Amino acid sequence: HTNLIESLKNTVGTLFIKPKIDISKISKHALGIILSLQKNKYEAYIVGGAIRDILINQNPKDFDIATSATPEQIRRLFKKSRIIGRRFKLVHVLDGRDIIEVSTFRAKPQEREIMANGVERDNAYGTLKEDAERRDFTSNSIYFNPTNKKLIDFYGGIDDIKNKQLTIIGIPEIRFREDPVRILRAIRFAAKLDLSINSDITSIIHKNINLLENIPYSRLFDEVMKLFLTGHALKSVILFNKFNLSKKFFPVLQSTNPSTQAFLKQGLRDTDKRIHESKAVNPGILLAVFLWRDVNEAWEK
């Protein structure tokens, strides 16, 4: 019986009826898309951050759907939709200003094609299990089928969330080399979800920090801003300094000057407070906080 259970888990993943997902936290738009896909005989699940946030009793803001339908099939099914992306084609399904991102199950490509920005090009489609394998962290690889209310967790993401552990899927060094921005994502999720990063991953991150130099500035800017706009900016700064990233991006974060530290902490606290109160946050204000010391010193000269 044990061998049979293990075989089933490897084939279909671990199915959970508990913990239960509060359907009321899922947007009606996302639910409608899944229903339409399933009615047309495609597999479809909500995956990623939305499910992770619901499991820790937070209200998700964004919903991603993974499906067996190809981008072209999705596009034909939803009139208000558009195909986007070069590295991997996605479909944005629109409902007014609301956008739901729908992606086709991915498989690992037989041969890697590295683009100019240092990231793998990846348009190989696959199965649900293969799609789970391609995701970065176990906490982002939990699938939910709202039709039968079941969670599918191939890599123990639910347990990792419960145990407050950030775990990468696959061999960490390979995964960080595939896309170095995962280093920043690891820090963001650790800060946002209060997860610990084990010593092995910490060591690998330190070894591969320089890979971030190959990423376009525009993409780095987006990821760094996300890191400080999760509502946990102070925690992010602690981790930023732990991995010596402040020196690369915002040296002021390493300042030992008491007045500079107080100014930075107040700016970060105010940003976190606005996010927790669901108020708008202008990234320009945060940048001004980071750059104020240097600008002020230049003015005084």
For each of these PLM feature ranges, what is it?
Residues 1-301:
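Catalytic cores of the polymerase beta-like nucleotidyltransferase superfamily
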